[in-house]
From Swiss-Prot:
InterPro entries: Ribosomal_Su5_D2-typ_SF, Ribosomal_uS9, Ribosomal_uS9_bac/plastid, Ribosomal_uS9_CS, Ribsml_uS5_D2-typ_fold_subgr. The keyword NAD does not apply. Gene3D superfamilies: 3.30.230.10. GO terms for molecular function: RNA binding; structural constituent of ribosome. Belongs to the universal ribosomal protein uS9 family. GO terms for cellular component: cytosolic small ribosomal subunit. The keyword Ribosomal protein applies. PROSITE patterns: RIBOSOMAL_S9. GO terms for biological process: translation. Keywords: Ribonucleoprotein, Ribosomal protein. This is Small ribosomal subunit protein uS9. It comes from Acidovorax ebreus (strain TPSY) (Diaphorobacter sp. (strain TPSY)).
Length: 130
């Protein structure tokens, strides 16, 4: 579908990102702020831009990302997943390359719940033999 706006929803851990892209100069805004301001760490910015770098569309699209929930790492992963889906919505021929890189698959790893009688999900009380 080639229209004015292409969109995609990405998820990672407890973060959800709604991504909207259109032809432009390469400006990326996250929750109304520039991506450099929103994500403090350079690795988070790099993770979010990976699909664009892979498909050589870094300077091609203006992207608006609305993301909520989770922390910085989860939000960057959700943004990457959403950008991937929006790129596929824009041009379906990009899907094999993005799939080969592993960006299309949703990372299903979630935090394991804390169990009763344990300190955390798996950490038990120290065992004393005597």
């Amino acid at each position: 579908m080639i229209g004015e706006w292409n969109n995609g929803t990405g998820r990672r851990k407890s973060s959800v990102a709604r991504v909207f892209l259109k032809k432009g100069s390469g400006k990326i805004t996250v929750n109304g702020k520039d991506i450099q301001q929103y994500f403090g760490r350079e690795t988070s910015i790099m993770i979010a831009k990976q699909p664009l770098a892979l498909t050589n569309h870094v300077e091609t699209f203006d992207i608006q990302i609305n993301v909520h929930g989770g922390g910085e790492s989860g939000q960057a992963g959700a943004a990457r997943h959403g950008i991937t889906r929006a790129l596929i919505d824009y041009d379906a021929t990009l899907k094999p390359a993005l799939s080969q890189a592993g960006f299309v698959t949703r990372d299903a790893r979630e935090v394991e719940r804390k169990k009763v009688g344990l300190h955390s999900a798996r950490r038990a009380k120290q065992f004393s033999k005597r």
